[in-house]
Structures are given as C-alpha cells and as structure tokens.
C-alpha cells in the first residue's frame, strides 16, 4: 500500500514540495531565506489579524486605537511590536534573498525571478500602506509625499493622485482604503509565493556552484527541514531581542505624535527599508526623473538576466564580479544612510554619486566584468 502522503491529493502536494523534494546537497545558509520569508509572512498575517480586531480605520480614532492596543489589550503591545519589527525582519530576509539570487545567478530561472520581482513590489506596497495606518505624523506626511509623486505623471498625474486619495488631500477616505488594501495584499502575496514556489519546483533549486546538481540530490526532509528550523529559531531570537529590548529602535519618534496636516515634520523619511530608494529619488533634481529612478531602482532587477554576459552562472569562481557585487552592497548601504540624512551638503553629493554608482555597477560594470572574465578563462 502506498504511503498516504504520496497518494492523498492534498498531502501529495505538500510531500512533493517539502518532504520528498530532491534538493541539491550543497546549498548553503543563503538558501534559508526563502523559508524564513514564508515564516515572516505567516507571522505578519497572524499578528496583523489580531491587530485588525482592535484597530479602527478612522482619522479621529486610528491613533487612539493603536495606543489602546498597546495599553489595554492583553499582550497587545507585543503583538503590535512583533508586527512592526516583523516587517523589518521581512525586508532584511527579502534583500538577502534577492542578493543571493544576484550572486549565484538564480535569475536564470526567468519565471521564478520575475514573480519574485512582482512579490517585492507587492510587499513594498503593503509595507508602505501599513506605515500609514497608525496615523502619526510620519504616517500622514509619508503618505502625502509618496502618493504625491504620482502627480509627476504627465497629463493624468493630478487626477490620479486625487483618485487615490479619494479627495483633495490625504484624509479619512485614504486611511480607510489603505487599511482595506493592507489587509488583502498579504493574502495575494501568499498566493504569489505559491506560484513562485511552483515555478521553482519546475526547475529545482540552483546551488552555489551554478552547475546542474541533478546527479547529486538529497531529500528535502529531514536535511533541509532541520536546517530551516534552525534558521527560523535564529530569526525568532533576533526578532524577540528587538521587540523585547528595543522595540522602537527602527521606528521614527515623530510617529508618536498624532497626524497634523498643519504641521510638517522637519525631516520626512520612510521606514529604514525604503531609504535606499528614497535617497535615489531625492538625488535627482527633476520630479519625474526622480520618480522614474525610484521605480527603476527596483525594476532594474528585471533586466539583470538580459545583462548576464558571463559563461558561468554563479559568481563563486568570478573574483572581479564578486568585487563589484560587494561594492554594490556597500553602495546600497551608503544610500540607506543618505536617505535618512537631511537634504544638505555633503549628503546631496554623496547621494548623487552613490545613485550613479549603483546604476553604473548593474548596467555597465558587471556585464563588462563578465566579458573580461570570459577572456581570462581563455588565457
């Protein structure tokens, strides 16, 4: 008799994805972040659901309802901070996951990569709308500034912004719709993640060498299930350290002031995980140019498979490309720092140089390095 996990219509899917899945024997800890993202998503949906039970999406009561959650609801404070800091962990895992894909050439799986890019955009949209919900100063002004960017679109821009706002400014209608979208999008993300996994399992996982591992596969369970559990425990440990010891470390103090349309905060900035894109936006003096650069800073990932010139898939044996990759990482960290600084010298110039460098690295230097490395192989 066949094992139920191999014959049952539902269990068969789980079995083929998480138990009997043939996996490369040499995938490193950089491959842990996919499962960690799944854990982050489940955690965000669960904590978010409990927060939604007590939250009110009305401009007059939103801020008070968040205070009420933290003060009066049983364990409301920990649920709120798990959700807020869980978003930070989510983005750390996301950026590492994308970085891993870049380094080891996982972008050669085109469908998986492109759905990943759609996922990244969707998660960013969800996080942005979630930041608006507590209705603090930075929530309100962040929503105003970022939605206003759409007014840079010629001809239809202003109409589009007012349509998104549901009025002539960010107000009750905006908050209500943002809450609705923030609630529904994680489920769309979960569905997309399922498709992401479906396409990945069509080809099988990549591995650090970038060479086919078909001749050396091991079952996912127990080898990688135990490895993923260890990763999950470390993730939860870091998250709990953050939540229990320094819950406001990554937040903005301005968001503890209720939203006031008549008082603009001195420095409007998004959450830390958007600062690199915000720095690129600010480093271009033209509004439409800035918006295009902002979108392109993420959308450039879609062009990476087209820009791959090397005969090798992975960067494991390509020292020049490795050097450029880590320069890109350092550059994005520099942009993250600049995004949190006021718009004044020397930060303006640093931001502009770092922005130009980030695009140059991806569009020019890395493809050229690939060609050079191909020639070095012939020597």
UniProtKB/Swiss-Prot annotation:
Q: Which domain of life is it from?
A: Eukaryota
Q: Which residues bind a ubiquinone?
A: 201
Q: Binding positions for heme b b562? A: 83, 182
Q: Which GO terms describe its cellular component?
A: mitochondrial inner membrane; respiratory chain complex III
Keyword Membrane on this protein? Answer: yes
What does the UniProt entry say about where the protein is found? Mitochondrion inner membrane
Required co-factor(s) are:
heme b
The alphabetized list of GO BP terms reads: mitochondrial electron transport, ubiquinol to cytochrome c
Q: Which GO terms describe its molecular function?
A: metal ion binding; ubiquinol-cytochrome-c reductase activity
Q: What does this protein do?
A: Component of the ubiquinol-cytochrome c reductase complex (complex III or cytochrome b-c1 complex) that is part of the mitochondrial respiratory chain. The b-c1 complex mediates electron transfer from ubiquinol to cytochrome c. Contributes to the generation of a proton gradient across the mitochondrial membrane that is then used for ATP synthesis.
Q: Which family does the UniProt entry place this protein in? A: Belongs to the cytochrome b family.
**Anything else of interest in the record?**
Heme 1 (or BL or b562) is low-potential and absorbs at about 562 nm, and heme 2 (or BH or b566) is high-potential and absorbs at about 566 nm.
Its protein name is Cytochrome b
This chain's source organism reads Vicugna pacos (Alpaca)
